[in-house]
């Protein structure tokens, strides 16, 4: 099988790029020849540009084109739109990382023009995005119906995607986020209990709630809280860690100081991927206190999961999560617990529960380790091969559907 993968890839720093790198390796191990035609290309920001880019390439040499859709990225979405109109096209597939929508962001010319105006106030841009949303949703549904197969990482995400995109249930496969195969490391000594926030550090991840919850535990039960340490770790890309109000990191550090937590909070920033397992496994528990954007809620329900949670599972560690996204499903296997997002008192109670009954940590860790075996990337790759075979059976090429169209000039330039 020959597959063209449309996705960001490292060294680009985002969760989908990290996912795609492991995904590509798992497919290679399953015997799939993976091409990455978007690698090194400039972003594609219009359907006309996508059609021109697609027309230059001979897609007859590919069995499946699979895209990683998420993060509001346009290149992959627009390329799939262009490919969908090709005669005798290959099978088209996508992993939807942010269901219930495919892209969430407008793709029309007005939005492109407005979004490029640095002087335009952010509320004005958001108003344009909201007014453009009916057209965005129409484009998403059109592409979703044209795809031969879609993948979500959770059942929750699949259910929302099917409903919002108006798809047949059998068009969507659920394939859990793959887990790296890592050496088992037992939990560290239970005094102190070490909590870890791990992920990109920017507003919207609810890190403030975690700091406030630990502060609440300390204020109410100082002796109990003395057995607690918190590490805040992750990426700090300047475009997300700094904003109009200054450094977000400085704001978090000031919050830690106001809560009297400075001696109990450690910071590990811009962690190298090779060091992630060691970082996670020297902690007892990951805490992901995400909050959903109220503005995004005007457009729908985002029910994706998290690469950070996948790391916790791979490393054999439990998690306390908010009920944002599809987190409640991901820790419903006995590998953690959840609380209502934004409820600092509920999060503080969860932390107190762990301090009072630390034996729960080993139970969560054991279940996480079992999940990691079930979701190992080599097995995940095989599941995707099955998904692609089903998509190929649905594709126009398999059904013998063909029509005349412009000849590709790709063979004159370079070969897939």
Model-inferred region functions:
Residues 114-150:
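Membrane-proximal helix-turn-helix segments that form the acceptor-binding/catalytic region
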Residues 280-303, 317:
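Acidic donor-binding loop of glycosyltransferase active sites
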Residues 353, 360-374, 386:
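A short, well-ordered alpha-helix in the C-terminal region of glycosyltransferases
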Residues 162, 178-192:
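Acidic anion/phosphate-binding donor-loop and adjacent secondary structure
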Residues 333-344, 352-359, 373:
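Conserved acidic donor-binding segment of nucleotide-sugar-dependent glycosyltransferases
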Residues 311-314, 318-321:
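Short hydrophobic beta-strand element within catalytic cores of glycosyltransferases
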Residues 244-277, 285:
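Nucleotide-activated donor-binding/catalytic signature segment of Leloir-type glycosyltransferases, i.e.
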């Amino acid at each position: 099988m020959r597959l063209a993968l449309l996705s960001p890839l490292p060294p680009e720093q985002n969760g989908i790029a990290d996912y795609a790198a492991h995904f590509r390796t798992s497919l290679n191990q399953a015997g799939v020849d993976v091409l990455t035609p978007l690698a090194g290309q400039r972003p594609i920001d219009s359907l006309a540009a996508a059609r021109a880019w697609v027309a230059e390439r001979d897609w007859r040499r590919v069995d499946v084109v699979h895209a990683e859709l998420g993060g509001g990225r346009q290149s992959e979405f627009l390329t799939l739109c262009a490919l969908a109109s090709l005669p005798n096209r290959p099978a088209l597939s996508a992993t939807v990382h942010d269901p219930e929508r495919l892209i969430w962001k407008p793709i029309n010319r007005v939005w492109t023009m407005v979004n490029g105006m640095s002087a335009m106030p952010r509320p004005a841009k958001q108003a344009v995005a909201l007014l453009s949303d009916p057209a965005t949703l129409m484009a998403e549904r059109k592409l979703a119906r044209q795809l031969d197969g879609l993948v979500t990482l959770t059942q929750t995400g699949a259910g929302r995607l099917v409903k919002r995109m108006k798809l047949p249930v059998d068009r969507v496969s659920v394939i859990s986020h793959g887990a790296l195969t890592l050496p088992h490391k037992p939990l560290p000594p239970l005094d102190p209990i070490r909590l870890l926030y791990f992920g990109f550090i920017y507003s919207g991840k609810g890190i403030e709630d975690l700091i406030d919850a630990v502060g609440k535990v300390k204020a109410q039960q100082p002796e109990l809280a003395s057995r607690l340490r918190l590490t805040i770790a992750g990426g700090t890309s300047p475009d997300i860690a700094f904003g109009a109000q200054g450094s977000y990191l400085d704001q978090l550090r000031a919050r830690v100081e106001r809560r009297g937590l400075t001696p109990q909070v450690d910071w590990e920033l811009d962690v190298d991927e090779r060091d992630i397992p060691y970082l996670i496994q020297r902690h007892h528990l990951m805490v992901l206190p995400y909050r959903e954007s109220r503005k995004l809620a005007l457009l729908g329900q985002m029910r994706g999961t998290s690469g950070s949670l996948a790391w916790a599972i791979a490393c054999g560690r439990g998690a306390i999560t908010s009920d944002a996204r599809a987190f409640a499903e991901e820790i419903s296997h006995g590998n953690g617990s959840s609380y209502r997002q934004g409820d600092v008192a509920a999060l503080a109670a969860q932390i107190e529960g762990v301090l009072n009954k630390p034996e729960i940590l080993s139970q969560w860790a054991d279940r996480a380790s079992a999940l990691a075996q079930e979701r190992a990337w080599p097995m995940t790759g095989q599941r995707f091969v099955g998904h692609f075979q089903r998509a190929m059976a649905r594709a126009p090429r398999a059904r013998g559907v063909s029509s005349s169209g412009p000849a590709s000039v790709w063979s004159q330039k370079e070969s897939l």
